């Protein structure tokens, strides 16, 4: 069925291979849970990764200049993915890289692993995708089916939280398990 998307790759991944796409997001979430499970019990509730002191020099400059540009590029790649090359995973990877760059320079600290906002960012994408999939049972006759004529807006509504979840998950995988400050 026509999706209204100009990018055949996105159309295929979100309509005919939707279960694979859902499981891709779930795998990132499970990988983060796996990394977090490596932390000792005493570290639970701490922040992922080592605490980084503020940097000076080129790293600090790049960490101040690049994230706003990377944010725009990452979001553009997600938006452009509906009609051309790009999409949620590529955009999410760029957003994650910008967060990690700012963390490496000591400009931001990751939130504690028990933070509600962090957990919401991690599960929002898979949860929204699953809810849309269940709605497909009632509206389109099968799990993960999209209602005719509404494919593009529904796909974009799925990709927005998926991008957030993928970006958060990839960044947290790089930061590692939580630790308590000494």
For each predicted feature, which ranges?
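Alpha-helical transmembrane segments of multi-pass membrane proteins predominantly involved
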Residues: 1-182
